[in-house]
Amino acid sequence: MSSFLGRLRRKKDKEQNGHTATSSDGAYQNGNAHRDSLVNDHICIPAQRNSLTVAQQSADIGSGSDHEGIIVKQKPQLAFSLDRLLIDSSALSYFIQYLDSTDKLNLIKFWMHVEGFKSSFSEQIQAAQELSLRDAKSIYDKYIDDGSTSSLALPRKIKQIVDDKLSASPLQKSCFDEAQDFVKSLFEYRYFDEFQNSVYYKKHELEVLSDGCSLADILKVQPLLLSFLEFIKEKEDHDTIQFLLGCDSFEANLDLMEDSEALGDAMALYEKYFSMQATNMIDLGSAIRAEMESLICEESGRPNRKAFRTAKTACFFRLHDKYLSDFLKTSYYHNYLGELQSFIDFTVELPRKVRNRAASSSDVASSTDSLTHAFSRHLEVLEKKMNDKDESTQTPTGSPSSSKRSTPRTPRSSRLAEVDEMGRYHALYDDSHSQTPQKPMRIKSTLRKYLDKNTLREEEIAEEVARTIIRDMQEMVASSAESPTSPTFRYG
C-alpha cells in the first residue's frame, strides 16, 4: 500500500500541481489551451502564469490564525469526484482511514493491489509474467475466494467471470476488471458520499485549503461560495458565477436528457446570459456568441457538449484574475478554515467496529454487566435526591402522610411513579416529552372560572368528601391494628 501511495505522490509531483481531467472539472483544466483564442473582440485574458503566493494580512484574518499564506491555484485541489480521489495520494490516505473506520478496508486494499498488478504486468518478459501470475493468485486467494477473511463477497456472476479469466491462458491484464468495476460502483454510490460527510473529508479540506485554493474549489464548497458571492460587489460578476454553476449542472446532466430537453436547457442558458435580449447580460463579444449559437443549434438537434466551453473558460478566468487573490486574504476564507479546524477538534471519532462478527459470550456478558452497573448507579443517585426531597417536605409523626413516606427505599424498590391517597397517578420523572402538546385554552378557562361556579363548587365538595372517607378508613385500619383481638364477622 505504501509503495502504491509513493507512486501516486511521484506522479503528482511530476504533474506540477495538475491532475488527470475528469468530467466535472475538465473544462477548467483544459481552459489554458484556449486563452490565446479568447482575445476576440474586447476580451483580454492574461497569459498563463505560475501560482501566486498570497501573503496573509493579520488584520483580515483575525487573532489566532496560524495560516502564513495561501497559494492561488488555477486547477482544482479538492477531491470532488471519485476519479480524482483515486489518483490523489493525499485524499486517498483520508479515504483509507474512513474505510478502516467502517470496517471496509478490504475494498480499497483490493483496488490498490489490482492497480499495482496492472502497473507491473508484462506479456513480453517470461519472468515478469510468472510474477504477475503469482500476484493474481495472491489477489484471488485474499479477496475473491469466499473462504478468505478479507473476501469481497462478490456476486456469483462476477466471481465466475474472474474465475474464467484466471483459468484462461495466457493471463490477461484485465482479469480483475469486473471485480474492480464492482468495487468502484460501491465507492461511487455509497462510500464516497459518506466519506464527503465525514470528519476525514474535513481533514482533507483543511489540509488542501490551508496550502492553496482555486476558483473551482470555491465553486464546489458551498460556505466558500456564499462568502465569495458576498465578497463580490458587481452584479455582472454575480451573473457570471450563476452562469458557471448553471453550465456545470447542464454538462453533468446532459447524458441523461432527451434531445429536446437538452436543447431547451441550452437555449435557456444562452437567452438568459448571452443573447441580445438577455435579462442578465454577460458581454463576451460577438465571436463567442456566434460560436455558442452554432454549437447549440447543430443538425442533429442535440446541443454540443462543448457549446459553452469557450464562454465558460472566459468567465472562469475573469473571476479568477479579478477576485481570487484578494478573496484569499479576507476573513471570509480564513474563518472557514477556522470552522473546519473546530469541527475536527470537537468531533469524537468512534472506535472501529469489531471485525469478528461472532463475539464471544463473555464479551457480551461483560458489556451487559457494565450497563447494569451504570444503570444501578444512576438509580442510586436518583433515589438519594428523592429521599432528600421527602425529608424536606415530611409532616409531623403520626399523620397519614408521615406513615406513607416512612418506608425506606432501595435502588431495587425505586419507582417511576406513585399513586397518592386519592388514587391519582403521579409520575416521578419528567414525562412532558411523551405527552401530546395541547394549545392552552385561556378563554375557555376564564369563562369556566367566572360562569361555571356551580360546577367548580361541586368538584371541591366531591374532593373533600373523598378525603374524609379515605381518612376514616385509614383511622379504622390503624385502630384495628392496635386492638388485641380482631373483630369476628358473622354472616347470616
Swiss-Prot record:
- What are the record keywords, sorted? Repeat, Signal transduction inhibitor
Q: Where is the composition biased (Low complexity)?
A: 393-414
GO CC, any one term: mitochondrion
Question: In its UniProt record, which GO terms are filed under biological process?
Answer: negative regulation of signal transduction; protein localization
Q: Does the keyword Ubl conjugation apply?
A: no
**Where is the region Disordered?**
1-32, 384-418
Q: Which InterPro entries match?
A: Cell_Polariz_PKAAnc, RGS, RGS_sf, RGS_subdomain_2
Q: Polar residues: which segments have biased composition?
A: 18-32
RGS domain residues: 81-205, 214-337
The record ties this protein, via Gene3D superfamilies, to: Regulator of G-protein Signalling 4, domain 2 (1.10.167.10)
Q: What is this protein called?
A: Regulator of G-protein signaling rgs-5
Which organism is this entry from? Caenorhabditis elegans
Gene that this sequence comes from? rgs-5
